[in-house]
UniProtKB/Swiss-Prot annotation:
PANTHER family: 30S 40S RIBOSOMAL PROTEIN, U3 SMALL NUCLEOLAR RIBONUCLEOPROTEIN PROTEIN IMP3. It is found in: Nucleus, Nucleolus. It comes from the Eukaryota. The gene is IMP3. Signal peptide: none annotated. Component of the 60-80S U3 small nucleolar ribonucleoprotein (U3 snoRNP). Required for the early cleavages during pre-18S ribosomal RNA processing. Part of the small subunit (SSU) processome, first precursor of the small eukaryotic ribosomal subunit. During the assembly of the SSU processome in the nucleolus, many ribosome biogenesis factors, an RNA chaperone and ribosomal proteins associate with the nascent pre-rRNA and work in concert to generate RNA folding, modifications, rearrangements and cleavage as well as targeted degradation of pre-ribosomal RNA by the RNA exosome. This is U3 small nucleolar ribonucleoprotein protein IMP3. InterPro entries: Ribosomal_uS4, Ribosomal_uS4_N, S4_RNA-bd, S4_RNA-bd_sf. Pfam families: Ribosomal_S4 (PF00163), S4 (PF01479). Keywords: Nucleus, Ribonucleoprotein, Ribosome biogenesis, RNA-binding, rRNA processing, rRNA-binding. It comes from Homo sapiens (Human). SMART domains: Ribosomal_S4 (SM01390), S4 (SM00363).
Length: 184
């Protein structure tokens, strides 16, 4: 026996059709990417998706121009240089590489993912926690936003903050700790 539904429960159930519900594939893919890269805000994923779509559209329009066109040569070189500097394409080869730029490409350049790649964290969840707690700096600036995109040139400058306990433990483990530097 099932109890009679209350008024507000009936009103809510009128909006839902349990017999003809649809599963959208892009939503499942979106959830998979959100979980894999530990994105905390869905807006980040939609922004990355819009950017990747704009890059692919721009590359398609540049490919439609004649090959000898000076504007095509300059614009495609500038686009490929920008994408290579951001780390979204592996080489500055051709415009066909722009077709492989996706939202996941942007997610791979986020600071926690770069920390994982540099083996500064064992798990992505720990890397996100390190960034949020202020243990990581990029160049001279402390970064507390996990959505920070790290370029190829800045990847070498990702390090621990000087006052971080994690840096102290790493230096002690490697027997490189200098008491004079850490006390200041």
């Amino acid at each position: 026996m099932v109890r009679k539904l209350k008024f507000h429960e009936q009103k809510l159930l009128k909006q839902v059709d349990f017999l003809n519900w649809e599963v959208t594939d892009h939503n499942l893919h979106e959830l998979r990417v959100l979980r894999r890269y530990r994105l905390q805000r869905r807006e980040d994923y939609t922004r990355y998706n819009q950017l990747s779509r704009a890059v692919r559209e721009l590359a398609r329009r540049l490919r439609d121009l004649p090959e000898r066109d000076q504007f095509r040569v300059r614009a495609s070189a500038a686009l490929l240089d920008k994408l290579y500097a951001l780390g979204l394409v592996p080489t500055r080869g051709s415009l066909e590489l722009c077709d492989f730029v996706t939202a996941s490409s942007f997610c791979r350049r986020r600071l926690p993912t770069v920390l994982l790649k540099l083996r500064m964290a064992q798990h992505l969840q720990a890397a996100v926690a390190f960034v949020e707690q202020g243990h990581v700096r990029v160049g001279p600036d402390v970064v507390t936003d996990p959505a920070f995109l790290v370029t190829r040139s800045m990847e070498d400058f990702v390090t621990w903050v000087d006052s971080s306990k994690i840096k102290r433990h790493v230096l002690e483990y490697n027997e490189e700790r200098d008491d004079f530097d850490l006390e200041a």
